[in-house]
Amino acid sequence: MKIVFLEPLGLSIDRIENECKTLKASGHEVVVYPDRCPEKNIERAADADIVIESNMPLRKDFFEACPKLKMLSIAFTGLDHIDLAECERRGILVKNAAGYSTEAVAEEAICMMIGLYRHIIENDAITRSCSGLPLSPGKEISNKTVGVIGLGAIGQRTAKLAQAFGCNVIAWNRTPKEIEGVTIVDKETLF
């Protein structure tokens, strides 16, 4: 089988090559491209059996140009950049890295909220440049209303963390969903 990495996925090519030694020893061909180049995706994957990538959009034209493709491995949680209907029609197995970053992304969202309310970036710059007195310490996020767009794993975890800080959480989700302590609203209300 020919396995094509359309991009290095944030890893060194040496590391990917090292991780793929067993595959190569078993007779598989592994090709790793050193950069993200969406306009070359079709050319790079045309004769691949397996394609590995993160979040570059792959649509019907890509799958039409890759008749041997049997599997698509997405090193990312979301799949909204993949034409899943076309994959299903062609019998292409699609796998993703579901759940790998849920906690990290939710924590980052909370960090950004705290940073915004507490003027962390501005105060850091003022302090490092010795250019004056820091801004006021800002405000707490407790008792603020936090809006969450999408209640997948990341959205639910972000809502739960916001609740732990004493926030009122409102959310919009594409499909109806009930989450304890979260008020579901329409998009217009959220924005």
Predicted segment positions?
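N-terminal glycine-/charge-rich "phosphate-binding" loop or analogous flexible N-terminal tail
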Residues: 1-48
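Rossmann-fold NAD(P)-binding glycine/threonine-rich loop
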Residues: 80-92
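A short, aliphatic-rich alpha-helical micro-motif
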Residues: 44-45, 63-66, 141, 189-191
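Rossmann-fold NAD(P) dinucleotide-binding segment
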Residues: 57-69, 84-86
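Phosphate-binding beta-alpha-beta segment of Rossmann-like dinucleotide-binding domains, i.e.
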Residues: 90-92, 97-145, 149, 160, ...
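Hydrophobic/small residue at the entry helix of a nucleotide-binding pocket
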Residues: 154
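Rossmann-like adenosine-cofactor binding region
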Residues: 59-63, 175-191
